[in-house]
Amino acid sequence: MAKIRVYELAKELNISSKELITLLEEEFSVEVKNHMSAIEDEDANLIKELLSGKEKSEKTKEEDDEIETTAKNPIKESMNNKKSNKRDDKNEKVNTENAEDMGIITMTSDTITVKEISDKLEKSYAEVIKELMLMGVMASVNQEINFEMAEKLAAKFDMEILKEDEDEKEDLEDILKDNEEEEYLQKRSPIITVMGHVDHGKTSLLDAIRKSKITSTEAGGITQHIGAYTVELNGEAITFLDTPGHAAFTAMRARGAQVTDIVILVVAADDGIMPQTQEAISHCKAANVPLIVAINKIDRPGANIDKVKQELTEYGLVAEDWGGDTICVPVSAHTKEGIDDLLEMILLSSEILELKANPNRKAKGTVVEAKLDKGRGPVATLLIQNGTLRVGDSIVVGSTYGRIRAMFNDKGRNIESAGPSTPVEILGLSEVPEAGDKFYQVKEEKTARGIADKRKEKIRDEYLQSTHKVSLEDLYNQIQEGTVKELGLIVKADVQGSVEALKQSLEKLSTEEVKVRVIHGGVGAINETDVTLATASNGIILGFNVRPDNNAIIASERDGVDIKTYRVIYDAIEDIKSAMLGMLEPEFKEVVIGTAEVRQVYKISSVGTIAGAYIQTGKLARNAGARVIRDGIVIFESELASLKRFKDDAKEVAQGYECGLSIEKFNDIKEGDIIECFIMEEIKKKTL
């Protein structure tokens, strides 16, 4: 059903928004928050009719009085009519001004400059500054004033000011107001999260369930990022989320628990309850999510199912066969024993939960994972929790938006639409969203862009906080001197899941002396914008599996910003921890001596892959360390196996020259790759 905003109806009725809001509450018992609230057209028409009838009644009474007065004194009436006409014209003008809602203006953040509010008020700078002076505030054109001051200033000019994020909230409420009555709801598939300690066999269990090999393709057999998969059993679908088991990825596990219906807690029969198992249990209890325990590795010689059940009772989980209500299923991912029993228990539990959704409403759900793909742009894995998402739909995701250009299911097949409980990979977003962000389908891309822009502006304003410079090496001294009360970190990684994990782990390091705050986290190479943000907020930049580009390196050297890069997530955490405790004593420092761009690639059967490269900065030296960087992400790290200038071996090749090179144990060099050459330089130990 169509709706109309309060301010629009006020204009039609020729009254102010405030008057209409009061009227709605007192006479019609309709509660509205502000002028941007929407009411049904049916209610609006009723209000118009009632007010119209009231006006007619008053008008008839006035006309009767006028006839009586005219009969008594026709000359006086003639003069009064002239005055009355002028008065009516004047009143009409005032009412017209009121109908424009006293000139309602909006603010997108907590502060606004004098120049901006002058433009919004359509007043000269001098008038606004004069009013501020009368209020006891001395402000220049570019100076900012807070919302309270702006509100008082607007009132001086008979204007009303509102924060735009309230409007945004109402916009989304209107967009998402769909009928959720029982007749519209249909049964949906359960969403299952698999949790547990590292090496207890979560991925192997999923592998056994899906009857496909994914464990062998992942480094070290450990799932590094959340994946979503759908399997079918007896014609019924089940959606699985696979969350990593490392303690550092607590945030990713917590995110999984928020979108799941049932948790499968994997516990190794030969290992029992471990730290990550305890954390998983805590997340399930906090989210009030039903839990099924899969006791894995029952084929191992040291397996003890009863011992696991005994340990579970310490956390309030009593097995059904022990008189409790926790479902425990012994399984073996290796021999496939108990897999069917586990799936049956999942379907049985989902039937008890009576999971339902409305597939005919606008889609909404959660971002499971997001990344930047070289050929396809921003790619996001979405889990649809309600409604149906189609190719061509416009969506808003956190502070980004887009129109879906293509959609793929978990098998990689191109699909046109997807309903509740379905994981999909989509293309078409303007930027890479945050993992865990909610997404909402909106009517058109313009609406999505508007909401995303408001959110982005708010986030940007929160970033720009500044203090003084700090580096990791002298952090402890500055803490002791009291010059550092807050350590700001900018975290960049190759995928969003790693950003979130680092953020969660780093912020836990806060102490009474210094608070650790991740002021920004993003996906992709470290760029100049990150350095600018670090400069403004006195931050340190941490890179995980990514490298800074040339502009970022130049800017960091110019502004004195510390950039640290890591391949292992725990090294980053330990470095910050050690620096804060005053135990950071580096023995070697990495020095980048040069970079080269691969212009051409030659494959020689007896030798391997040879790259023809152009030295962009510094120099390349034989036997020095070398990294292969593709799209800002470190692909491989080793050392230069050979370095030639024409046909001759060269010890080093300087900037501006071309050379031929090969990387030790690496043959997948491609045109456009950047080769970064570095040496490890010994430095004196520091006592911080």
From Swiss-Prot:
GTP binds at residues 196-203, 242-246, 296-299. Residues 332-334 are annotated as: G5. Residues 196-203 are annotated as: G1. Residues 187-354 form the tr-type G domain. Pfam families: EF-G_D2 (PF22042), GTP_EFTU (PF00009), IF-2 (PF11987), IF2_N (PF04760). Keywords: Cytoplasm, GTP-binding, Initiation factor, Nucleotide-binding, Protein biosynthesis. Residues 53-100 are annotated as: Disordered. Its main location: cytoplasm. GO terms for cellular component: cytosol. The keyword Transferase does not apply. Belongs to the TRAFAC class translation factor GTPase superfamily. Classic translation factor GTPase family. IF-2 subfamily. One of the essential components for the initiation of protein synthesis. Protects formylmethionyl-tRNA from spontaneous hydrolysis and promotes its binding to the 30S ribosomal subunits. Also involved in the hydrolysis of GTP during the formation of the 70S ribosomal complex. This is Translation initiation factor IF-2.
